[in-house]
Amino acid sequence: MAKYDSHLKCSFCNKSQDQVRKLIAGPGVYICDECVELCNEILDEELYDGNTPPAAAPAGGRRETPKKPSRSLPSLAQLPKPQEIMRYLDQYVIGQEKAKKVLSVAVYNHYKRLAAKANPGSVGVSELDEVELQKSNILIIGPTGSGKTLLAETLARMLDVPFAVADATTLTEAGYVGEDVENILLRLLQVADMDVEEAQRGIIYIDEIDKIARKSENPSITRDVSGEGVQQALLKMLEGTIANVPPQGGRKHPYQDCIQIDTSNILFICGGAFVGLEKVIEQRIGKKSMGFIKPGEQLSVSREQRMANALKALEPEDLIKYGMIPEFTGRLPVVATLDPLDEKALEAILTQPKNAILKQAQKLLRMDGVELEFEPAAIAAIAKEAYRRKTGARALRAIVEELMLDVMYEAPSRRDLKYIRITAEMVERRSTRELIPHPSTLPKPESA
């Protein structure tokens, strides 16, 4: 360190010694603390490859993660239109037409808002250019296995943006055992390879959001750290804030480096089954049958169908009565409701989507040289059993995996298996062993 002299200057930025905190002397040159810090940042940017963490920030300070080149936001002309989004969703999601239309419009408007922020003045009308477009997050309500998560991840795949899924049941208010809400952002950041700019244009799906409803309609004297407390913690994140995210996850503490993420451009989609919400709606309108079914038919209507009928009359006040605080409900203005899946819908899910479960099984066996075919009656039997289990489309894969176990086990080692036909009887027995002859029953090759 050189002795104090107001005439000494940094050889790089030309600032005098009284303009900087430190001035380091070398053989005929001087460098200030600000230029040293700048050099460190330049080295970090050049050496950082996305996997090796950047150099630690000085004690008490924060250093932003060096940014890799990010894809720019698409222009308004490049954005897929709602009808294009709808057609893409149709390839992967069966039914749920109203929900797909709601999501298509909401997602299009969200990324149109981002395009407007990136290109101010794009409207061309001066009084409209000054209008600020607010973010509209989405709430999806539907029974288990109806396609809530599938819709969200399909949207993210089409738009080619980072997508992360979080479970609301693991979250607690800051200071209590459990995950901080900022860990949701860390998952998105990890999917984006720690690229902050890329993560800030992504989509986060928060599942089981109904599980953080407060325990009673009236505010409680005791702390509700996994219910109302989590809703309060999520408010700013949903609305848009600069959040400090610990890069290693876990709880934050004052002496660790944090990555700052702006959530104002992140689209949040929350989903939940909201079991019992139909009772709240029916109580509000004062009708037990809801007017959607004839008198005397109530006993024949399933709980899922009763829920679907009730959701047609859903109002924000019903969600508040259920246990969502008014501020939280207000930050999810777009609501999409999903219908329960009947047997016909489950049959379609087995065969029609691009990545249908039966198509996946056929592809796996074709790789072993085996052609697989399902009789229509077998498909109907699988759908019937899945409907009986009351877990929606999730049951389909479990049934098919159980049914195909023996075939998948034998096929890679057997050259005599060229064609397999699955019947309804096999589905009912959950076994395909009769299709596979035991090696001892095959004719022995003639000796030379």
Swiss-Prot record:
Residues 50-76 are annotated as: Disordered. Pfam families: AAA_2, ClpB_D2-small, zf-C4_ClpX. GO terms for cellular component: HslUV protease complex. Residues 1-51 form the ClpX-type ZB domain. ATP binds at P143, T144, G145, S146, G147, K148, T149, L150. GO terms for biological process: cell division; proteolysis involved in protein catabolic process. One of its GO terms (molecular function) is zinc ion binding. The keyword Cell membrane does not apply. It comes from the Bacteria. The keyword Zinc applies. Zn(2+) binds at C10, C13, C32, C35. InterPro entries: AAA+_ATPase (IPR003593), ATP-dep_Clp_protease_ClpX (IPR050052), ATPase_AAA_core (IPR003959), Clp_ATPase_C (IPR019489), Clp_protease_ATP-bd_su_ClpX (IPR004487), ClpX_bact (IPR046425), P-loop_NTPase (IPR027417), Znf_CppX_C4 (IPR010603). Keywords: ATP-binding, Chaperone, Metal-binding, Nucleotide-binding, Zinc. Belongs to the ClpX chaperone family. Component of the ClpX-ClpP complex. Forms a hexameric ring that, in the presence of ATP, binds to fourteen ClpP subunits assembled into a disk-like structure with a central cavity, resembling the structure of eukaryotic proteasomes. ATP-dependent specificity component of the Clp protease. It directs the protease to specific substrates. Can perform chaperone functions in the absence of ClpP. This is ATP-dependent Clp protease ATP-binding subunit ClpX. The gene is clpX.
